[in-house]
A protein has these predicted regions:
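A short beta-strand-turn-helix
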Residues: 36-57
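N-terminal targeting signals for export/organelle localization
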Residues: 1-37, 164
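Short pre-active-site segment immediately N-terminal to redox-active cysteine/selenocysteine motifs
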Residues: 55-57, 61-65, 127
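Thiol/disulfide oxidoreductase modules built on the thioredoxin-like
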Residues: 103-107, 114-164
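Structural microenvironment flanking redox-active thiols in thiol-disulfide oxidoreductases
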Residues: 70-105, 115-121
Length: 164
């Protein structure tokens, strides 16, 4: 708990200094993904990251009530044909999430549910959307806070997909 408090204050200090949220780096970069249980939406099973072993994938925290999530939806739908994307529904109601996916498309290979926000805390998420690029060894190599822009798509996601 103390470590989360320290991370919060470091991030808050950087925001106060004028750094944009997108520029703030995660302490998880270069580390293995957190080993926590994520229950799948509409299933009583957990997401198994072992099936992504030796594969690159994207993990995206989103919510139906999140305007930037709606803005990035077309790019995530475009990316989903090239690489698996795991979605984590953050503090969302089931019926709202279903409506969101119907209206904006479902780019996700699997969807996990984070009703209480505890999964987001473990991942160091402080808002939605946040997107993580995870390499074939299960290491987080990049984190983006905020909606995925065409620039991030071109400069970060495409090279990640192409393993450049």
């Amino acid at each position: 708990m103390l470590s989360l408090l320290v991370i919060f204050f470091i991030k808050f200090e950087k925001i106060e200094k004028g750094e944009s949220i997108e520029q703030i780096q995660s302490p998880l970069i270069g580390k293995n993904i957190p080993n926590i249980k994520i229950i799948k939406f509409n299933e009583n099973q957990k997401i198994s990251f072992s099936k992504y072993k030796n594969k690159r994938f994207i993990l995206n925290f989103f919510a139906s009530w999140c305007l930037p999530c709606k803005i990035e939806a077309p790019l995530l739908n475009k990316v989903s044909s090239k690489i698996p994307i795991i979605g984590i529904a953050y503090k969302d109601k089931e019926e709202d999430m279903i409506k969101f996916l119907k209206n904006y498309g479902n780019p996700f290979s699997e969807i996990g549910v984070d009703q209480l926000g505890s999964i987001a805390i473990e991942w160091g998420v402080y808002g939605v959307p946040e997107t993580f690029l995870i390499d074939e060894n299960g290491k987080i190599i990049y984190k983006h806070a905020g909606a995925i822009s065409h620039e991030v798509y071109k400069d970060k996601i495409i090279p990640f997909i192409n393993n450049d």
